[in-house]
């Protein structure tokens, strides 16, 4: 039905007859000549119909937006005065000689030109229309090219694309599972995988050595801009490779991808330990485009008569950190109050501040409600450590170390945006040396997952002092987003059992949930390591989209619903009966 895509016709085709198919993007009658912008996935082209062919002209005059049509005509160069530099095909146009309406379109339920006027609900309900917009189409085409590039790289490096099961068993990976009832085993359920973690480890035990898969994963969790209940991972696992080798190989892949797709050379990725990232940036995924840093000042404040500072300064689990914002002395009291409310979202009880109005005047040139608690030497040292200059403001976080990191880390990002401080377009890094465990409500939890290997300790040493152990794990971070995370895996039964016990998983529970893994570890398991990238997030960053919903063909809403298909829906009662499932409605209490 076509000889060319609309966006592929160019000056080299002048004088040729072409057959095009697509959708009417816009149609206008200017002085008895109909100009038609025809659109397909590759772009737009202008088609001109004049009254010399009355039958065709009359049909062209009836066209409306989103009619699906076939056009036949002659490619010709546009007059110089009509060249459109904003269009890929702006140097040429097609003189229409034939026109067939393949399918008419009813009046549209949403705006194609001013899509900002469409609600998110409308865009998802009529996704097949929303995806016709060039911006959306180009993102999905870009995504397809990225996955093709990734496959080429991994195939050429000896990785095997092997599928793993979708119907599997629930495992503790930090989020709720989506459950699928079994008809043949009444009362029992499959779980949709949150990742192929255990299966890819089993593939290493099976001797396949290098595995990859571009795979759907599922997590029933609260959603936000960069989360979806179903998402896609670039999943990688290797045998007989160290963490350094895995990082080198996947960094090579990512650098090659950016060079091929965006003509961007990311350069060599710097390394940063987890502790350094948390200390300097309050985040384990720091955005290095932002020059602001947290500075520890607790040692200066242990003796001050201001409990807000001295309390955390003398607490082993406390922290006092300063954040300098260049030019921040211009902030109004209301703006400072807004920042105070902002850090309160993250658990901070307040936000002390110090304006450097004129450094040459000493204390006289400094304005702060806490200045009366600080002597001149302390103030001078705070100014020196933060590098503050006249016109700056210093903001202070004082609380438990975790609260300070989270609240001041978030404030650092907000201030960086508010003051337009971001430098450079792409700043990647590796974050390494994560803790093995973190304590939540007195219990140990795995920072990554329970199959991550510790660095340089025996099972007995790990159990004796789990709190201070470092994992052989690594995260690739770009512009404050975690692109992917991985680790060396545990490859002996003794260590795996020790980790389970530290996590409060009894030997009996471990046998029930992970017996197959523990048994597999007895039969010559090779050392192995891997990494998983979030494909949706990578595409979002590379295309500049504001949400991963804009780089997925058919995403869910923030409430995990699909307006297009009205999923989820109620199940047929007969099917529920076959599954042995009864739906229990929650009783609503009424007041007398």
Curated annotation (Swiss-Prot):
UniProt subcellular location: Cytoplasm
EC class: ligase
GO annotations of cellular component type: cytoplasm
GO terms, biological process: aspartyl-tRNA aminoacylation
Region (Aspartate): 197-200
InterPro entries for the chain: Aa-tRNA-synt_II, aa-tRNA-synth_II, aa-tRNA-synth_II/BPL/LPL, Asp-tRNA-ligase_1, Asp-tRNA-ligase_1_N, Asp/Asn-tRNA-synth_IIb, AspRS_core, GAD-like_sf
Keyword terms: Aminoacyl-tRNA synthetase, ATP-binding, Cytoplasm, Ligase, Nucleotide-binding, Protein biosynthesis
EC number in record: 6.1.1.12
Positions bound to L-aspartate: 173, 219, 448, 489
Catalytic activity: tRNA(Asp) + L-aspartate + ATP = L-aspartyl-tRNA(Asp) + AMP + diphosphate
Signal peptide: none
An example Gene Ontology molecular-function term: ATP binding
Residues bound to ATP: 219-221, 228, 482, 534-537
Domain of life: Bacteria
Keyword Transmembrane: no
Family recorded in the similarity comment: Belongs to the class-II aminoacyl-tRNA synthetase family. Type 1 subfamily.
Subunit structure: Homodimer.
Free-text function comment from the UniProt entry: Catalyzes the attachment of L-aspartate to tRNA(Asp) in a two-step reaction: L-aspartate is first activated by ATP to form Asp-AMP and then transferred to the acceptor end of tRNA(Asp).
Protein name: Aspartate--tRNA ligase
Species per Swiss-Prot/TrEMBL record: Shewanella baltica (strain OS185)
Underlying gene: aspS
């Amino acid at each position: 039905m076509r000889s060319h895509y609309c966006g592929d016709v160019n000056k080299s085709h002048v004088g040729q007859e072409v057959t095009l198919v697509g959708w009417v993007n816009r149609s206008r009658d200017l002085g008895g000549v109909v100009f038609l912008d025809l659109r397909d996935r590759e772009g737009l082209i202008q088609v001109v119909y004049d009254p010399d062919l009355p039958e065709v002209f009359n049909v062209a005059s009836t066209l409306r937006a989103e009619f699906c049509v076939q056009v036949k005509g002659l490619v010709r160069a546009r007059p110089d005065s009509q060249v459109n530099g904003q269009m890929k095909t702006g140097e040429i146009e097609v003189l229409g000689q034939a026109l067939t309406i393949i399918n008419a379109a009813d009046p549209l339920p949403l705006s194609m030109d001013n899509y900002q006027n469409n609600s998110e609900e409308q865009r998802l309900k009529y996704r097949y229309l929303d995806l016709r917009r060039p911006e959306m189409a180009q993102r999905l085409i870009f995504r397809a090219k990225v996955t093709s590039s990734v496959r080429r790289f991994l195939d050429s490096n000896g990785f095997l694309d092997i599928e793993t099961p979708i119907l599997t068993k629930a495992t503790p990976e930090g989020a709720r599972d989506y459950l699928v009832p079994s008809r043949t085993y009444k009362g029992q359920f499959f779980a949709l995988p949150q990742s192929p973690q255990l299966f890819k480890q089993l593939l290493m035990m099976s001797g396949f050595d290098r595995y990859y898969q571009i795979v759907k994963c599922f997590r029933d969790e609260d959603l936000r801009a960069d989360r979806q209940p179903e998402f896609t991972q670039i999943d990688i696992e290797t045998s007989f490779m160290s963490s350094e080798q895995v990082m080198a190989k996947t960094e090579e892949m990512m650098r090659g991808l950016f060079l091929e797709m965006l003509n961007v050379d990311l350069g060599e990725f710097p390394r940063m330990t987890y502790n350094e990232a948390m200390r300097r940036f309050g985040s384990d995924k720091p955005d290095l485009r932002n020059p602001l840093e947290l500075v520890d000042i607790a040692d200066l404040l242990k003796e001050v008569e201001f409990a807000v500072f001295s309390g955390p300064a003398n607490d082993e689990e406390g922290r006092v950190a300063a954040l300098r914002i260049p030019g921040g002395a211009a902030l109004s009291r209301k703006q400072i109050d807004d920042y105070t409310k902002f850090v309160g979202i993250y658990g901070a009880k307040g936000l002390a501040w110090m304006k450097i109005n004129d450094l040459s005047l000493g204390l006289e040139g400094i304005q702060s409600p806490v200045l009366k608690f600080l002597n001149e030497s302390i103030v001078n040292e705070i100014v020196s450590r933060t590098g503050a200059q006249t016109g700056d403001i210093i903001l202070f976080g004082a609380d438990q170390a975790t609260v300070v990191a989270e609240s001041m880390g978030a404030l650092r990002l907000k201030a960086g945006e508010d003051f337009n401080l971001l430098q450079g377009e792409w700043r990647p890094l590796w974050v390494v040396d994560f803790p093995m465990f973190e304590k939540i409500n007195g219990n140990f939890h795995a920072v990554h997952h329970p199959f991550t290997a510790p660095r340089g300790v025996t099972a007995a040493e790990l159990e004796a002092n789990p709190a201070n152990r470092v994992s052989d794990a690594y995260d690739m971070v770009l512009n404050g987003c975690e692109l992917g995370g991985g680790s060396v895996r545990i490859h002996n039964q003794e260590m795996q059992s020790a980790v389970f016990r530290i996590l409060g998983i009894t030997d009996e529970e471990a046998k029930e949930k992970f017996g197959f893994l523990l048994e597999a570890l007895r039969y010559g398991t090779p050392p192995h390591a891997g990494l998983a990238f979030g494909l949706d997030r990578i595409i979002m960053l590379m295309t500049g989209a504001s949400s991963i919903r804009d780089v997925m063909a058919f995403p869910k809403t923030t409430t995990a619903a699909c307006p297009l298909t009205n999923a989820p829906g109620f199940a047929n009662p007969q099917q529920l009966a076959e599954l042995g499932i009864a739906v229990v409605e929650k009783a609503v209490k009424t007041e007398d």
